[in-house]
Amino acid sequence: MSAASTKLAGDTPVATGAFLFLLLFFTSCATQKDVQHRVVISVKDQKLALLDRETPVAIYPVSTSKYGVGDWQGSYRTPLGELEIAQKIGDGMPPGTVFKDRRRTGEIVGVNAPGRDPIVTRIIWLRGLEWQNVNAFRRDIYIHGTPEERNIGLPVSYGCVRMRSADLIQLYDVVGRGARVTIVDQPLVAVVYGLPNAAQAALTIRSGMTIH
């Protein structure tokens, strides 16, 4: 078949160029990373800070691993270092929506339901960007909701970062795919510029308030 016989009507250099431009434009939009927001998680403090253009705007209590920090397979530890948001799962789902293997089960679990500890409400799936957290995505390291909200602020997870459902929904609705997530084993005030003093920060964290 000749090249002429496969040429589409209107397939001029101008038309082809316009098509490629639009294709690249929409592909770029679909894959554009969130560079405005950053999340910093302190294992030491069991706290998470949300930054907007590097300015802290909210802090929340969290729960990291009961086994400490690390990233090897089967360790059930929370990885340290620079990561990014790879996927977001659970748009619009009611608080307490149960997920298994990142799929909704159809069940909704209440806060502090006795004997229940599934992943609930939303899933923010993290991908490691460094050697020290290269296994994070394969290990299914998430920021996710938990029914056991009474334990938030204590290290009781199996590697993930747990949040209260209401706090998680706030965070989920702000950050986009590609946003950086930094996990450190230091106090937040040591790594985030512009945080309030320790006493004010403690009040802010307990109440779940923003800190504009």
Describe the role of every protein-language-model region.
Residues 38, 59-61, 82, 140, ...:
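Well-ordered beta-strand positions in beta-sheet-rich domains
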Residues 45-47, 82, 123:
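Structural motif
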Residues 36-58:
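Post-signal peptide N-terminal segment of mature Sec-exported envelope proteins
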Residues 34, 72-77, 93-212:
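Exported/periplasmic cell-wall-interacting domains
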Residues 11-20:
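Sec-dependent N-terminal signal peptides
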Residues 57, 61-93:
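Electropositive
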